[in-house]
A protein has these predicted regions:
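Conserved non-catalytic scaffold segment of RNase H-like nuclease domains
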Residues: 2-110, 133-146, 152
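Ser/Thr-centric signal marking residues that sit
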Residues: 8-11, 116, 165
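Short alpha-helix plus adjacent loop in nuclease-associated cores
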Residues: 114-134
Length: 198
């Protein structure tokens, strides 16, 4: 089964542009996941949209950084990038660490989603309880739990965060505490029903 692990970096939190996206396509069989494709690009804010200073503090994606990393033969804006849609056409299963946020920016509906943060809250029992509940695990908490090496200087880059999320997902594939959630996620669906924007 094909699964896509992805992450976005955006120009704010709501009603804003995608500045960077990274997606890794996997072939998942049992407890094994093999990388079979990758998509990674940078984009500019939509016309008339100013750079969000608070977002820059998190992701560091200034206009200069985007100019440096952007290829001139690629679409300027994420909404114009049909190649990303094509990259995603053969799967209906998506993984992200905060998928409720990231999926808002995709140009199609996700049918099957797996949130490593949400599942992690149920299985990792991260310390520092709030309101008698375990806290949501950050990407770094989940990485530490599954013994994934980290470089904190690279956090909040779509490419690096996707790679870390991928390794966490691989760990979860083998985790008996996640088996029930994983089985539900990996059920077969009809790809033709995916609501892609063309």
């Amino acid at each position: 089964m094909k699964v896509i692990v992805f992450d976005t970096e955006t120009n704010g939190l709501n009603n804003c542009s995608v500045l960077s996206i990274s997606a890794i396509k996997l072939e998942v069989e049992g407890k094994k996941a093999k990388e079979i494709g990758k998509f990674e690009r940078y984009y500019f804010p939509e016309p008339g949209e100013k750079y969000d200073e608070e977002a820059i503090k998190v992701n560091g994606l200034t206009e200069e950084v985007l100019q440096k990393n952007k290829s001139s033969n690629e679409p300027k804006y994420f909404k114009e990038d049909k190649e990303f849609v094509n990259f995603c056409k053969d799967t209906d299963h998506y993984v992200a660490h905060s998928i409720a946020f990231d999926k808002k920016f995709l140009p199609f509906e996700i049918k099957n989603e797996f949130c490593t943060k949400q599942i992690g809250k149920k299985t990792m029992e991260v310390d520092e309880k709030t309101k008698n509940e375990y806290r949501w695990p950050r990407l770094s908490h989940a990485a530490k739990y599954y013994n994934v090496p980290m470089d904190e200087s690279k956090w909040h880059g779509a490419s690096y965060d996707t790679k870390i999320c991928l390794e966490i997902f691989k760990g979860m594939l083998k985790d008996p505490n996640v088996k029930e959630y994983m089985n539900d996620f990996l059920k077969e669906t009809n790809i033709k029903k995916n609501s892609f924007v063309r």
